[in-house]
A protein has these predicted regions:
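C-terminal alpha-helical cap of glycosyltransferases
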Residues: 133-152
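Acidic donor-binding loop of glycosyltransferase active sites
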Residues: 49-59
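Short acidic alpha-helix that forms the nucleotide-activated donor recognition element
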Residues: 42-50
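Catalytic donor nucleotide-activated moiety binding site of glycosyltransferases and closely related
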Residues: 1-39
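Hydrophobic/aromatic beta-strand patches that form the interior of the parallel beta-sheet core
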Residues: 14, 36, 53-55, 73, ...
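Catalytic binding pocket for nucleotide-activated donors in carbohydrate/polymer assembly enzymes
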Residues: 26-33, 60-128
Length: 152
């Protein structure tokens, strides 16, 4: 609520909580036209097509978002605690394809200034994905046909 209010009328926020989160997010009555809780939506990837900026914490959605060239902010207010309790496969700050913020004020400032460190997205994509050329479906179809021809 505070973030939406601080950013002003030009922003709408879609909330999609992790499926294991059972807490219901309380949205102020006067912000319900700008904060939309789609936590019950089945398919996260569909939401990415209407996403101008992804604000996340430690979610693997960054892989899908990077393929769509979506700028990202990482709201890691509890990073030290998260590392202590769960940790990561990679060094978090080296791994993420965007800017890390630790407070709501830092998040608001980054959004207002469009300071997302978006240049990290391209490097991230090429580190984790091969053949990013829009022809993956064709390669899969060719492989299936090839395998079917081997059986005949």
């Amino acid at each position: 609520n505070e973030i939406c209010t601080a950013l002003g009328e030009n922003y709408a926020i879609i909330i999609k909580l992790h499926p294991f989160c059972k807490e219901k997010y309380e949205i102020d009555e006067n912000l319900r036209n700008r904060i939309i809780d789609l936590s019950e939506a089945d398919e996260l990837n569909d939401l990415l097509f209407v996403t101008d900026l992804l604000i996340t914490d430690y979610s693997s959605v960054v892989f899908e978002a990077s393929l769509l060239d979506i700028p990202m902010l990482f709201y890691a207010f509890d990073l030290d605690e998260y590392i202590e309790n769960r940790d990561f496969y990679y060094d978090f700050k080296e791994f993420i394809p965007g800017k890390t913020v630790a407070t709501q004020d830092e998040l608001i400032t980054a959004v207002r200034n469009k300071d997302f460190e978006s240049e990290k997205v391209e490097n991230f994509k090429h580190k984790f994905f091969d053949d990013i050329d829009g022809k993956s479906s064709q390669r899969v179809a060719d492989k299936i046909i090839s395998l079917l021809n081997l059986e005949n």
